[in-house]
Amino acid sequence: MKIIVAAEELPICASRMEPSEAIKNWISTPLKKIPHPDKASKIQIEFGDRSKESLHLFAKPHFMVPDMLDDDEMFFVGAPGFYSPEEFSDEDCRRIEESMKAYRCYPIFQKRVKYSKMIEEILGKNTYEFVQSNFDHANMFARYKEYNTRWHEKIMEIYEEGDVVWVMDHSLFLLPGMLGNSIPVGMSASVPFSSLLKCIPFWEQIFSSILCCRYIEFNESSSKESFDLLVSQKTGFCMGDPGYKDIREPLTCVGKKGIDKDVLLKMSSEVHEFEGLGKGKVILLPSDSQTHLLGVEAYLSRYGKEITVLFLRTRVLNGDSDKQAEVMRLREYLEINYKVLSREFTPASDPEFISMLKRCDLCHCPEVADVCSLFGIPVVRNNPYDFFDIADEINENLMQRGEGSKEGSSEVIGKMEWKKRFMTSLLSISGMEYDVDLEPKEPRIRSSLSMDQTGHKKVDAKKKPGIRKKNREKEEAVEIILNNKEDANAARIVNDFKKSKARTLVMDYDGTLTNIVARPPMAAPTQEIKDLLIRLGKICRVVISTGRSVEDCDKFFPKEIEVFAEHGACHRIDGKWKEGGTFPQKDLAWRIGQFFLARTPGSELERKKTGYAFHFRNVSPLIGVKQARALFELLMRVCKDYVKKGNHVIEVRSSKKSCAMEKIEEGFVLCAGDDVADEDMFDVCKGYTIKVGDQSTSAAYRVKDPENFRMLLGRLLE
C-alpha cells in the first residue's frame, strides 16, 4: 500500500537557476505587470537572466511545505514546484518527469486554473469578484474539470488495490468524485468552509465530489460545523435531497497541518535577527491582500501608534495584478497619513525566513500562522473582514508582546504527528488495518536532489513500500444466490459442512439472523429462529457473537446455545456466564453517554455490564448524525481503544467480537455477520466468512439479507 498525496504543487522544484534565484524570480516576475507608476520604487523585483542550460532539482524551503520526501510511504502527484510552462520544452518536461520518479514525485505540467482562485476567494468571504464581475463560469468550470482529470489520470497510472489517496488542495475538489467510492480518499481542507460554498457556480458538483471522501480534516471548528450542517441538510430524512440518499457521510475532524518544527527551531539558534525595519512594532502581512491591510488601517486610525508593516511574498500573484496595485495604493495612503514604514520581503531560504520572523511582533498573515506560533509570535485570529475587531486584537497583542510567548508552542504539531492523526483516522474509517511508518526522518533527499539521480534508485510505484498490511488482501465478496439451488458456492459450503467431523457456526444476531428493527427491545427471535438454532446445535457447535447485553441474551437464546455477549466481553457456556475485564474510563464514558441521551430526542442508551450502546436510528437525521458524531469524537478522546461506530449506533465496549474465534476447533468453520464490528471476526476466521447485506467487507462471501442467510442454514440441516 502507498499513500498517494495529491497536491497542486510537488515539494520538489525544477529550474535552470540556483534555488534562491529561482524562488525570487518565480514570485517577483508577475509584479512587472502591476499597473502602478511607482512600482519600481516600492518593490525590489528580482529578475534573473542568468539562466543555465542544465536543469537541476531542489526542494522547497521547510517553511513552505513539510518535508516528507524521505518518507518511503509517501508518493506525490502535482505540478513541479514554481512551474512555468514558458521555461521548459517538451524534452525538458520528459527529463524532469524521469528524474522526479526517483524521489516518488510524479509531475503534471499544468498551471493552476482560475476556478481554483474563485473557490479560495468565495470561501474566504469575497463573493463579488467572481460571482458578479466575471460571468464566464461555465468555461472556468470546464477548465477546472480538465485540471482535476489530469491529476486523476496520473494517480491511476501508479494506483494499486489497497492504496489510499490524500488530497491536500482545494484546486482538486473534483478529484475524490473522479476516484470514486472504491478508493479510500482523505482530504486536508486548505481553505475555510462555510455556507458560502453555495455561492460558487456548479457548487453541487463540488460538494458531491467532496462527499466521496472517507475522512476530511478541517483547520477550524467553524468549518467542520458548517460542513456537517450542509451534509445533514442534504441527507436528512425530513428535508433531504433525494439525490444524496445513497451518500456515505465522511468522518470529519478538526486538526492543524503539520510543519517541520524541529528543523525550524534548530535553525532559529543559528541565525541572527533581521535588521533595517525601523523602531516601531513589526506586523507581518501577506503582500497581496488589501483586506488584511485594511485591518491595519483600522488599527492606525483608532490607536495611531508607530509601526512597521512587513509584506511577505511567498507565493506568486496568480496574475491578479490589479489587486496588487490596489494594495500598493493603500500602502502609499498609510505611509502619507500615519507613522508607518513598509517593506517587502521575499525569503528564498529557511534561514532568511527565520531571520525575518525574529524581528516580527505580530502575524496577520494566515499562510505562515503556524510557523509564527512555533516561534511565539502572536497571530491575529479574528475574521479579517471585521476590521475594528482586528484593530482591537492587534493593539491587545502588541501591548502584551513578550509577556508569555515562548518558542515551541504546544499548539503547533509536527509533520509526523499530522501524518499519524490523519492516516489513523482515514484507515480506520476505511476499515483498513496497517502498520503505518511514523518514525521521524532525517531530510537526506532534500540535500542531494539531482537530475542525474546520483545515488538514488528509481522507485517502482507498483511495488508497495513502507506500510505492512496486517491481514489478508480484501477482495470483492462473492454473492451466494439462495433461490438458485444450483449455486456452486452454496453447494460447496453444504458439502464441506457434511463431510467435516468438527463443525462450528459463529453468527451475529441483529441484522444477520433477524432483520434490524426500529427499537432494540423489539428484536426478540421468533420461534422459527429458536428452533433453527436448537436443531443446528444438535449436529454442530453453534456460537452467537453479539453486541447485546447479558440480560437480552438470556431472554433471546436457549440456554444450550453458546453465546458471546457485549462483543465478546461476556461468555455463556452451558448456561453459565463468565465476565471479561473492563476499562478505567468506563464510568466517565457512561456519564458522557447520559449527557448526549438527554440532548438527543429519540435516542436510546442501552447499558451493558462492560459498556453501553448509544442508538440513534429513530432520531431525526438532522440531529442524530451530528450528535452521534460529536459523541464519537468525545469518546475517542476519553477511551479511543474501546469505542466503535456501528449501524446507527455508537458502542463503548471492553472487548472485540474476534474473542469468539479464539477457541474454535479445527474443521469446518462458518462465520457470519452484517456490521463493522463483525469484520474483527472475519479477519481471524480460517473458514468460510459471510457478510449479510451490501456493505463493504473483508468476508469472502455475502448473502442478500437475514432471510437468505437462514435459508443457507436450513440447507445444512437437509
From Swiss-Prot:
Q: What class of enzyme is it?
A: hydrolase
Please give the residue ranges the record annotates as the region Disordered. 449-470
A GO molecular function annotation here is:
alpha,alpha-trehalose-phosphate synthase (UDP-forming) activity
Compositional bias ranges of the Basic residues kind: 459-470
**Its Enzyme Commission number?**
3.1.3.12
**Keyword field contains Hydrolase:** yes
**Can the keyword Hydrolase be found in this entry's annotation?**
yes
Matching CDD domains: HAD_TPP
UniProt-listed Gene3D superfamilies = Glycogen Phosphorylase B, HAD superfamily/HAD-like, Trehalose-6-phosphate phosphatase related protein, domain 2
User: What stretches pass through the bilayer?
Assistant: none
InterPro entries in the record, alphabetically?
Answer: Glyco_trans_20, HAD-like_sf, HAD_sf, Trehalose_PPase
Provide the reaction this enzyme catalyses.
alpha,alpha-trehalose 6-phosphate + H2O = alpha,alpha-trehalose + phosphate
A GO biological-process term: trehalose biosynthetic process
Family assignment? In the N-terminal section; belongs to the glycosyltransferase 20 family. In the C-terminal section; belongs to the trehalose phosphatase family.
Q: Which PANTHER family match?
A: BCDNA.GH08860, TREHALOSE-6-PHOSPHATE SYNTHASE
Q: What is this protein called?
A: Probable trehalose-phosphatase
The organism's lineage is: Eukaryota, Fungi, Fungi incertae sedis, Microsporidia, Unikaryonidae
